[in-house]
Amino acid sequence: MSSSRPVFRSRWLPYLLVAPQLIITVIFFIWPAGEALWYSLQSVDPFGFSSQFVGLDNFVTLFHDSYYLDAFWTTIKFSTFVTVSGLLVSLFFAALVEYIVRGSRFYQTLMLLPYAVAPAVAAVLWIFLFNPGRGLITHFLAEFGYDWNHAQNSGQAMFLVVFASVWKQISYNFLFFYAALQSIPRSLIEAAAIDGAGPIRRFFKIALPLIAPVSFFLLVVNLVYAFFDTFPVIDAATSGGPVQATTTLIYKIYREGFTGLDLASSAAQSVVLMFLVIVLTVVQFRYVESKVRYQ
């Protein structure tokens, strides 16, 4: 029986092939994570010239800080809104293209445009549209008697950053959902149609279970996106306000580490955020992935 395992002429070639990825991982993940863990156990002066070992004192102080706990729950709420809304909206548009306006190249191109926009630019775009004094959308809302001012209303500020973040991520999710729907064998869809199943029933009974692995992958990706990659949106749109209503953990880390120069506290917050994302990812892979396997 022949083995399908590749054979290299040189024993060092496999190591050379994986070396670039290992170097990148060490430099951009393991090293910074180690530095953050070391600083989280120290009391560091604002300029980082001297430090003193304090053990877990930074973490104890952290979880007794009401502002940090508020940011923690804001992050959970914000990430849930962005992840769930982004997946549902993207799946809806992908199904719309596949089952209703299939073949519309213009529509598909239009759906991919937000992916080419930088997160900060996306935030600025929606700030212009939601500007309390001159925004097109706020003018439209005013016609119905709704007063919009996200600089003073915490609920409106949260809606703005969630909306901008979801809009920025729609293209990415749409691309994967649309490709997954396209990969479903046409024979299954045609057989269901012959049996009298309508478009909605075909989608929920056939398409949705078959694209479950892609949905799980996007769930993990969108969760990480909401935790980390939405920082430019929040910074450009609300700067964490009003009254820290949109201050997430990643934004609080930036503000205390780079603005307040509290290196020890920001490092401790980074470690907590890192372990939180790792735990959530492991839980998803353990308990969610097992439910999306199909023959």
UniProtKB/Swiss-Prot annotation:
Swiss-Prot/TrEMBL keywords: Cell inner membrane, Cell membrane, Membrane, Transmembrane, Transmembrane helix, Transport
Q: GO annotations under biological process? A: transmembrane transport
The organism's superkingdom is given as Bacteria
Which PROSITE patterns would you find in this protein's record? ABC_TM1
**Main location group:** membrane
Please give the name of this protein: sn-glycerol-3-phosphate transport system permease protein UgpA
List all topological domains (Periplasmic): 33-80, 131-156, 229-262
Which stretches of this protein does UniProt put in the Cytoplasmic compartment?
A: 1-11, 102-109, 178-207, 284-295
Q: How does it assemble?
A: The complex is composed of two ATP-binding proteins (UgpC), two transmembrane proteins (UgpA and UgpE) and a solute-binding protein (UgpB).
Gene Ontology CC entries for this record: plasma membrane
How does the record classify its membrane topology? Multi-pass membrane protein
**Main function:** Part of the ABC transporter complex UgpBAEC involved in sn-glycerol-3-phosphate (G3P) import. Probably responsible for the translocation of the substrate across the membrane.
Q: List the Gene3D superfamilies.
A: MetI-like
Q: Which family does it belong to?
A: Belongs to the binding-protein-dependent transport system permease family. UgpAE subfamily.
Q: Where in the cell is it found?
A: Cell inner membrane
